[in-house]
Amino acid sequence: MGSKAKKRVVLPTRPAPPTVEQILEDVRGAPAEDPVFTALAREDPLGPSGRTEDAEAQREQLYFQSRIYVAMNQRLQQAGAQLEQKRADLQQAGEELERDISQVGHVALPSTAAASLG
């Protein structure tokens, strides 16, 4: 019978990352209409004052979103702690129930056995 050992696949070595000079050369050589440069560029017909107001509004929106996120995160942590406590309580109740069932079984079995023998 042949060995069923799995052959290990040897991957080629990872190429070295580009140097800063290579990155700069690549960026300088890219055309201005390259999607990398145009994807984030927004046309703003309002002019410079509109940009300032938009930036301020965006900062405010991000601030409020951050506050909502932090509040929600705190609520989730509290809910997680409450669930953990409830889980522990249920586990303890289950263990007590198992003990009670076991005690009832031990009490009921001897009397049943004696009645069936007599």
From Swiss-Prot:
PANTHER family membership: UPF0449 PROTEIN C19ORF25 (PTHR34766:SF1)
InterPro entries linked: UPF0449 (IPR028227)
Pfam hit, one: UPF0449
PTM-bearing positions, type Phosphotyrosine: Y63
Family of this protein: Belongs to the UPF0449 family.
Origin superkingdom: Eukaryota
Coiled coil: 69-105
Keywords, in A-Z order: Coiled coil, Phosphoprotein
S-S pairs: none
Name this protein carries in UniProt: UPF0449 protein C19orf25 homolog
Keyword Thylakoid tagged: no
